[in-house]
Regions:
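Amphipathic, well-ordered alpha-helical segments in soluble domains
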Residues: 10, 31-34, 38, 64, ...
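Short charge-dense sequence patches
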Residues: 4-16, 40-41, 75-83, 98-108, ...
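Leu/Val/Ala/Ile-rich N-terminal alpha-helices, chiefly Sec-type signal peptides and the beginnings
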Residues: 2-72
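Long, charged all-alpha helical bundle/coiled-coil segments in cytosolic proteins
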Residues: 57-113
Length: 149
């Protein structure tokens, strides 16, 4: 058996790390899609007034986010990738919209486990989701609720 040269050992080590990173990236992409899907379904349930279902979907998204964040701790380049942060933003948006519609306190970034930038983007997008709620309340002639939202 031939012993690899120092350069060969270094190259093998790099290849193993890159392969691990690629696998982690693939898992993060898939999990990010699932989180985004759950968050979108939570927002839809919120619009339909199905707050218990919205909460259930949101909880599942948040649980997946916790697991994903733990898995990505050793891979900051993947954690900070746009597709991971976008998934976190979508989950935060669903949580913010649900909180406002359900008359609950507005959750903070730390409550949701998201970075500040993702939270601020979620806050802006939740405002556009609330536009639909306002229009629905206006159609129902519920001016007080529309004004509140």
């Amino acid at each position: 058996m031939v012993t690899p040269s120092p350069a060969g050992r270094i190259a093998e080590s790099i290849v193993r790390r890159v392969e691990g990173l690629a696998g982690t990236r693939d898992r993060a992409l898939g999990e990010g899609r699932q989180i985004t899907r759950l968050a979108a379904n939570s927002v839809r349930a919120t619009h339909r007034g199905e707050l218990a279902e919205a909460e259930r979907l949101l909880t599942e998204a948040q649980n997946r986010m916790i697991v994903l964040k733990a898995e990505l701790r050793p891979y900051p380049s993947v954690y900070w990738a746009g597709y991971v942060q976008d998934a976190m933003k979508e989950a935060a948006e669903a949580a913010i919209a649900l909180a406002i519609v359900a008359d609950r306190p507005l959750p903070e970034p730390a409550d949701l486990g998201v970075e500040d930038a993702a939270y601020l983007n979620a806050l802006a997008e939740a405002a556009s989701e609330l536009r639909r709620q306002v229009l629905d309340r206006l159609r129902e002639n519920d001016l007080a609720r529309a004004e509140y939202l």
